[in-house]
Amino acid sequence: FEKAGDCTIATITENPKIAEYNAMIIGNSDLPPVADRLPDDPFVSIPERFIGKHGGQLNHLGNAHEAGTAEFTSARNTNLVVFDDVLGKIYPLVAQSWEWNDDFTELIVNTRPGHKWSNGDPFTADDITFWYNDFILDEVMHPKMPALWKVGGEPMIAETLSETSMRFILPKPKPGLIAQMAGYYGATYLPKKFLSQYYPKYNPDADKLAQAAGLENGYAAVHLYTHGTDWTDAMSPILKDKDAATKLGRHVKPMLEPWILFSSDADHRKWVPNPYYFMVDSAGQQLPYIDHLYERFVPQREVRNLMIGNGE
């Protein structure tokens, strides 16, 4: 990254208001220096036109939480791998690299050493394995396993090889799996350290922990933090059960996205920058540039048109 960005970790600069925004993320502790918040090898995003600067707010109007806001929310989508701008070549994003075996039945995914979740916890290969084994394959979380993550009608095997390396073993060859990950609307990883405290298999007090927040059991807490991508469900724990999320100590689960949701109700959503975001620009500024994302929900088309015309 030093060659691409013409900078070193020691010269990375941060958003001057990042400590203020970090304080808005319920459950986050005080921030360490920016050099300690980035991976050893950050992703360098080289601007197409010019170097940006931190600040500003991006406003968006939508009908409702579940009504066609994908073009706005997709700006935050942060997959292991990503298509380039013309949907051609696939590049590593959250992942540092990947490699197939000769017959496309084993996929090794390597993560970035030092990468961290939005609360400062380490992001490791185990978070990918946990997503598949303890979320996708879990019969409570998914009574019917999502067919998308089967190969030839059978589940894959996910195993952690090291802190920064994991492997998918496929029952049949599927070279298109990496493209499927690049185009997936969700994330193929979950914060194991945070969520495992609500799984009885990892924590014998999982149910008690959740029940103290007014939830039925530990799995209800996992559901609270993970099932917000289905249009039939509330889009965030803040909307589902803000009181329970507050008692559990975190309004949203730790994320890797550039912005973190901190406010949500029937008529709006607001985000602030992720203080541990793993990207920098070619001038060594930690991304994202934009301070706030603000989405307002206005169901009446005429009112939306008037607001747009007024520059709101």
Locate the predicted segments by residue.
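N-terminal low-complexity, Pro/Thr/Ser-rich intrinsically disordered segments
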Residues: 1-34
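Long, low-complexity, polar/charged, intrinsically disordered or flexibly structured peripheral segments
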Residues: 220-269
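Short, well-ordered beta-strand elements
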Residues: 52-66, 96, 106-109, 128-131, ...
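Surface-exposed binding/hinge segments that line
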Residues: 147-236
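Aromatic- and charge-enriched surface segment that lines or borders ligand/interaction sites
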Residues: 97-141, 167, 177, 304-307
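Extracellular/periplasmic solute-recognition and catalytic clefts
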Residues: 131, 135-145, 158-160, 260-276, ...
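N-terminal lobe/hinge region of extracytoplasmic solute-binding protein
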Residues: 27-28, 32-102, 254-255
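Ligand-site clamp/hinge motif
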Residues: 111-113, 246-250, 274-312
